[in-house]
Amino acid sequence: LSPDELLALGQKGRKQTVKRGQTLVWEGDDSLVVANVISGVLKLSVSTADGREQIVGIVFPSDFIGRPFGKESPYSVTALSDAEVCVFHRSTFDQFAREHPELQHKLLQRTLIELDDARQWMMLLGKKTAEERIATLLLRISERLSADGCTGPLLNLDEFELPMDRQQMADILGLTIETVSRQLTRIKSSGVIALPDRRRVVIHDRQALLDLAEAA
């Protein structure tokens, strides 16, 4: 979109702060809004038949949330950290998209990227070991959080705060919380990373972490 079009679109939305643990959209609700993530990290989750939560995605700054042309939300959207989003009424966004074909093209690109991403995660869950899954997740988080530099100071890729706890990591990766804790300790003991506290991660040897992630 051109700068003028971006400005026009921005004027149709409103900024909203979402506190850690607060749900922005509930699974099954009418899809009344869409949003762009300005800062923070949010999770996409669905409820299983037995009532458990399954995390199906993580969204970072610059990511888009919602189904512009959908009827209802296929998942809940909940903040993993304090976040700020720009929210648009779906009908307003739909009308703007119809008037600006370039935006529809961008939405199609986004859909294809999400499809590729889903295929990569299928491989991760189906082929990689627990250690490889955790290494992949740590790398993904460090790389995506660096995008926050577009709205603030550039973050250090090699030092960041995990937006989720151990149980949520386990849910995302299809592991038990015990396995997640054990593998994190193992990677830490090898000197590849440091864990100053429960949330903080420092990558000491990025190449070694890449090697762990790509061992499969």
Label each residue range with its predicted role.
Residues 34, 58, 87, 163, ...:
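Short aromatic/basic micro-patch
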Residues 143-216:
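Phosphate-/nucleic-acid-contacting segments
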Residues 1-20, 63-65, 70:
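Cyclic nucleotide-binding regulatory module and flanking cytosolic helices
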Residues 98, 102-176:
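Polybasic "coupling" helices that flank or enter modular domains
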Residues 22-82:
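Cyclic nucleotide-binding regulatory domains
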Residues 57-120:
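Cyclic-nucleotide recognition modules
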Residues 7-8, 24-28, 154:
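Short loop/turn motifs at secondary-structure junctions and domain boundaries
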